[in-house]
Amino acid sequence: MKKSFKAWFYGKFFHSLCKPQYKKRGVSDISGIIKEHKNIYTRAKEMNDEKLLSSYIMGMYFIAMNRVSGLSPEENYRILEDGLKESAMFRKGLGTAEAYLDEKRMAARYEWAAESKKRKGENNWVLDVLPKCSEYDLGYDYYECGICKICKDEGCPELAKYLCKLDFMMADLMNAKLVRTKTLAEGADYCDFRYSLKR
C-alpha cells in the first residue's frame, strides 16, 4: 500500500494507545509490533477510502499485536479497547450521537456509498446507507469489509471478528444505540448496522 502521512499517523496513534496497556499487563518489549505493522502495511492491497483508513490501519496493527505480543486475541482486543476508551483524542473525534445521526449528513453519506461501489481500492469497504425509519435513525449494510480482507490476505481471517466488537464500544461512547444481527467476519452475507439515539 502506498505510504501517506495519515496512515503513518494512525499507526503511531494506535501504538501510543496500546503501549501503556501492555505495560500494565507486564508485557515490556513490544517494539516488534511496530516492525511487523510496517511489514503488513508494505504488503497490503490498496484501500483508498479516507473515511475508513483508520479502521484499515487498525486492522493491520491488530494483526501485528497478535503476532508479536504473545497474548491471546481476546487479550489483545482488550488492550486496544481499553486504550481507545482512555484516549481523550479518540473520544473527541467520535463526537456525539446527535451529531453523528444528523440527517443533514445523509446526502454526503449517499455519495460515499455510491463511490464505494466503484471499488477503486481492492480492499475498500462496499456499502449501502439506509435512511431513518420507525426502527432506527441510520442504517448501513456493508457487503465488503477492508478489515476482513486484510485479515484474510494475512492468513488470519479469524481475527476480524474481534474488531467487530469495537463498533458497540464506539456507539456507547457516543451515547448511541447500535443493533447488529450479523457480520461478514462471522460468515454472513453482509453486516447490518442499525443506529439510534438512546431514549
Pin down the residues of each PLM region.
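Short, hydrophobic/π-rich interface segment
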Residues: 126-186
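Short coil/loop linkers at secondary-structure junctions
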Residues: 28, 72-75, 157, 177
